[in-house]
Amino acid sequence: MGRKWNNIKDKKASKDANTSRIYAKFGREIYVAAKQGEPDPESNQALKVVLERAKTYSVPKSIIDRAIEKAKGGSEENYDELRYEGFGPNGSMIIVDTLTNNVNRTAADVRAAFNKNGGNMGVNGSVAYMFDATAVIGLEGKTADEVLEILMEADVDARDILEEEDSVIIYAEPDQFHAVQEALKAAGTTEFTVAELTMLAQNDVELSEEAQAQFEKLIDALEDLDDVQQVYHNVDLGE
C-alpha cells in the first residue's frame, strides 16, 4: 500500500484552503458528469461519485444545483477528459487528470508546467502502470475491526483497512466505491471524511530537501492550472 491517506490529505491542506478554486473544479466535473448521462445521481453512477466526493469538500448546494441545471439546459459547452503522465526531479512520477474545452491549450500549459519546474512530459502509459486505481473511503467513530466486520457481513471486499489518526481509511477496488459506503450507511455511518476515486502509487520515493522543494513547485504549478482536476504522484513528502 502506498502513502497513508491522511499524509496525502495533510499536504493538500493549504491548497484546499483555496475554496473558490476547489468549488470551480467540482462545478465543472459535476456539469460534465450530468451532461454525459442523466442529471439524476440515482441513475447516473458517474454523477453520484462526483457528488459524494463534493460532499466531503463541503461544496455548497448552490454550486451543485447550478452545474446540474446547466447540464439540463442543454449547454453546448463540451469538455474532454484527458490524462497526462510525466516525471519530476529524480525520476519521481506524476499523473495529471484534466477536463478541458481546448485540448491544445491544456497540453501546452501542462507541458510548460513540467518544463519550467524540473520535470518532463512522458508518453501515454509511461507512468500509470506504477499506480493503482483505488477507492478511498474514510470515516470516524469506528475501529478498523468494526469496519471489517461490517464489510464482511455485507459481502463487500476491501484491499486494506487502516486506522490513521482519528479516522479509519478503507482502500478498495474502484467498483466498490458505492458498495463500501452503502454498507457503512446501513450500519449507522452518516458522514464520510474521505470519499475519493484516486490513483495510489505502488511504491513511494523520497527526495532530497532540494529536489523535494522543486518537486513541490512543480505540483503547485500543475494544480494551479484551471483545466487540471487531479494530480497524483509517488513522492513521500513526509510530515
Swiss-Prot record:
Concerning Pfam families, the annotation shows: TACO1_YebC_N (PF20772), Transcrip_reg (PF01709)
Q: What is its main location?
A: cytoplasm
Protein keywords: Cytoplasm, DNA-binding, Transcription, Transcription regulation
Position of the signal peptide: none
Q: Where in the cell is it found?
A: Cytoplasm
Q: Recorded GO terms, molecular function?
A: DNA binding
Q: Does the keyword Transcription apply?
A: yes
Q: Look up keyword Transcription and say if it applies.
A: yes
Superkingdom of the source species: Bacteria
Q: Name one GO biological process term.
A: regulation of DNA-templated transcription
GO CC terms of this entry = cytosol
State the SUPFAM superfamilies in the record. YebC-like
Gene3D superfamilies reported for this sequence:
1.10.10.200, 3.30.70.980
Family as reported in the entry's similarity comment:
Belongs to the TACO1 family. YeeN subfamily.
Report what the protein is called.
Probable transcriptional regulatory protein Bcer98_0465
